[in-house]
């Protein structure tokens, strides 16, 4: 006898007869409720642009961080449950530091994404052999990793299933479907960094419900000459004027 749909819904480590893990699928759907984040990789560097949702005038916008530094050569943008994102970002930072201490070299972006994905898939009904408690559900967050490795810009995407893939351009979050289509139409492998910034902001402008301004968007660039660099409000405003 097969279990009912609701029973497969509750089990995070039980496949349905169709070969599906419903809790992982639901976690992926949860990301579509999060703010939109866009990453574009160019020969000059990588751009991350993220929507910041200020849900109350009493909130302090500067405390809502959507783009964070993992290491000097790796930054990431997240969409989904922020509490889950902080846990995964903390793991990424620890792994990068451990790699530096042990091997005296920077961790590759792919290895960093792989280390985070290893934690992301450690959900189930029992703990591991070391006695650590297992998580009761998948992480409801997707991450865009942007970095420089051997002088080459890279962009990686990881979702709640633990799958991590390298991209030329990628959109996640509530406006990801429309944004992804726009990126497919406009992306070229030979884009300049400024063109990528304008495309990312223009794409956010199309999918965001609010009017684009320097308060509700964050922009970060990663280049060989200047690694993790967060744009100031004035710089963001200038680029918004360029696409007006």
From Swiss-Prot:
One of its GO terms (cellular component) is cytosol. Disulfide bonds: none annotated. The keyword Cytoplasm applies. InterPro entries: Ntn_hydrolases_N, Proteasome_alpha, Proteasome_alpha-type, Proteasome_alpha_type_5, Proteasome_asu_N, Proteasome_sua/b. Its main location: cytoplasm. The keyword Nucleus applies. SMART domains: Proteasome_A_N. Keywords: Cytoplasm, Nucleus, Proteasome. One of its GO terms (biological process) is proteasome-mediated ubiquitin-dependent protein catabolic process. It is found in: Cytoplasm; Nucleus. The proteasome is a multicatalytic proteinase complex which is characterized by its ability to cleave peptides with Arg, Phe, Tyr, Leu, and Glu adjacent to the leaving group at neutral or slightly basic pH. The proteasome has an ATP-dependent proteolytic activity. Belongs to the peptidase T1A family. The 26S proteasome consists of a 20S proteasome core and two 19S regulatory subunits. The 20S proteasome core is composed of 28 subunits that are arranged in four stacked rings, resulting in a barrel-shaped structure. The two end rings are each formed by seven alpha subunits, and the two central rings are each formed by seven beta subunits. The catalytic chamber with the active sites is on the inside of the barrel. This is Proteasome subunit alpha type-5. It comes from Drosophila melanogaster. The gene is Prosalpha5.
């Amino acid at each position: 006898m097969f279990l009912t749909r609701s029973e497969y819904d509750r089990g995070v480590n039980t496949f349905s007869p169709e070969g599906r893990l419903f809790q992982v699928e639901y976690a992926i759907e949860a990301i579509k409720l999060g703010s939109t984040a866009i990453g574009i990789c160019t020969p000059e560097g990588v751009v991350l642009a993220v929507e910041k949702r200020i849900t109350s005038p009493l909130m302090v916008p500067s405390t809502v961080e959507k783009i964070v530094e993992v290491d000097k050569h790796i930054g990431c943008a997240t969409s989904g449950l922020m509490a889950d994102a902080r846990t995964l970002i903390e793991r990424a930072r620890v792994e990068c530091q451990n790699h530096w201490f042990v091997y005296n070299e920077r961790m590759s972006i792919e290895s960093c994404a792989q280390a985070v994905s290893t934690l992301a898939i450690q959900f189930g009904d029992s703990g591991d052999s070391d006695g650590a408690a297992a998580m009761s559900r998948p992480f409801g967050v997707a991450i865009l990793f942007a970095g420089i490795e051997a002088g080459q810009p890279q962009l990686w995407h990881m979702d709640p299933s633990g799958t991590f893939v390298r991209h030329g351009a990628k959109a996640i979050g509530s406006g990801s479907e429309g944004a992804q289509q726009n990126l497919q139409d406009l992306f070229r492998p030979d884009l300049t960094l400024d063109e990528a910034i304008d495309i990312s902001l223009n794409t956010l402008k199309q999918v965001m419900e609010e009017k684009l301004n320097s308060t509700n968007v964050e922009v970060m660039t990663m280049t060989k000459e200047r690694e993790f660099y967060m744009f100031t409000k004035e710089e963001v405003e200038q680029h918004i004027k360029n696409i007006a």
